[in-house]
Amino acid sequence: QLAGVTRATPDPPGGHIVRDEHGEPTGLLQENAMELVERVIPAPTLDDMVEALRRCNDAYVAAGITSSQDAGSDHPLQVEAYQRAVERGVLKLRTSMMIRHQLLPHLLGLGIKQGFGDDRLRIGPVKLFADGSLIGRTAAVSRPFLNDPRPDNYGITIWTQEELDELVWQAHAAGFQVATHAIGD
């Protein structure tokens, strides 16, 4: 409701608003439809993010984990939070950050390329999402999901092939590898 999602709100490209039998939104937003709500959620502060990294780091280290990979940083503040965590000595894990394509222009503007960093924190490939997940029944599949309320549910493709090709070329032209989330068949 706070995001203004109503029965008249169309599904965004690459997303789906789950609706009840009367066409009313149920509150479940799949894939890119989540962005409708993310826009109205207050952003965490830099200190909140550093504290969250500290807590996660402590739990991982206590479990004997020494390395991690953030598979989808999409905001400049996330990069800064990781850097502050390193500066404050709270990031003990060796961490590689996959960056979402939205963050690529920002990093390039700073002269940052894949591999930038040190043994504690490094910028990795660009992360793209081609489809959703199996558990959410949003992976792009060649046959509809069985026992789904929507008998024609073939999942969600986030991008057209042309859009995906363009994003891959942009990343490669900038010197980045691409890691693509592609769960469906």
Which residues does each PLM region occupy?
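Divalent metal-binding segments
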Residues: 1-110, 124, 128-184
